[in-house]
Amino acid sequence: GPEAACMLVDYLLNTPEGTELLKKVSLALVPVANTDGYAMQIRKSGSGYDLNRDQSKLTDPVTLLLKKAYKEWNPEIALDIHEFNPFRKEFELLRGTKTATAADVLFLPSGHLNIPAGIRTLSNGLFREEAEKTLEANGYHSGFYFTPSVRNDSLYAMKDAKSPQSSSTFQGLTNAVSLFIEIRGIGLGRACFARRAECGF
């Protein structure tokens, strides 16, 4: 996430294409929302909260600051980039061996029905589909982000965020075209680091 954001900043400020783009759009970037957790390489913030589950409760001071900035900016498009663990315990439970998700990037659009249908269509259709085409053209693999579970020796995959605790749902409920983007990375250390940063960019 943060590396891809830095690559985007470099592109916008130091290339002719980026300079032209900045004449047409206004951007606000938050390279790292949970700076304490990022520094300690843990999910929770320095206050002990999971910022990914604090979109409605607004318990953490960082969440309040981010919410305030988001409200003031009032974006038309909102992206939230995270990392996912390609080795899912559910795969290992079924197969008895570690199995990795093949995708470089996974997309989680919101399926919350209080988000206008047109915005959901734009998020899940045009924006996601164009991103997937660009990724494929550059040699990367993508798919839908899903939450796996094992029941009766079968794997179930739930996709589309519906909880307002999810950033893609919260952002969609503000009438922004919203996508939650997951890049493979958790547990990989520096392995394939350049590929992971570049596919996010």
Predicted region positions:
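Structured catalytic-domain cores with a bias toward divalent-metal coordination
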Residues: 1-201
